[in-house]
């Protein structure tokens, strides 16, 4: 179920403060807040999103506005299905 429109988008205030203070800077902004919605103020910034193990840098563009940060940093690594053990030798 999507969030109610009368509540507005969710974002962590500390992340917005970091984005506003990093205006003009090329350094990525590190965050663990995967639940925050991407706002128009973030466009053009590089945000390093934590995926549980390390930080994955993502450049924010206009098409990402309205999505959540966690959508652009995957947390699971697919190693492949079983397969034939004999072909590996």
From Swiss-Prot:
Its domain of life reads Bacteria
Q: Which UniProt keywords apply?
A: Ribonucleoprotein, Ribosomal protein, RNA-binding, rRNA-binding
Which Pfam family, just one, is annotated for this protein?
Ribosomal_S19
* GO biological process terms, semicolon-separated: ribosomal small subunit assembly; translation
What family does the entry list?
A: Belongs to the universal ribosomal protein uS19 family.
NCBIfam families attached to this UniProt entry: rpsS_bact
User: What does the UniProt record say this protein does?
Assistant: Protein S19 forms a complex with S13 that binds strongly to the 16S ribosomal RNA.
What is this protein's record name?
Small ribosomal subunit protein uS19
Gene source species: Xylella fastidiosa (strain M12)
Q: Which gene encodes it?
A: rpsS
């Amino acid at each position: 179920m999507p969030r109610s429109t009368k509540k507005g988008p969710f974002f962590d205030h500390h992340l917005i403060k970091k984005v506003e203070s990093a205006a003009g800077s090329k350094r990525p902004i590190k965050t663990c807040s995967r639940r925050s919605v991407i706002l128009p103020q973030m466009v053009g910034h590089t945000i390093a999103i934590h995926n549980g193990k390390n930080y994955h840098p993502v450049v924010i563009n206009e098409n990402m506005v309205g999505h959540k940060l966690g959508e652009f940093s995957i947390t699971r690594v697919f190693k492949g299905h079983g397969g034939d053990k004999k072909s590996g030798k």
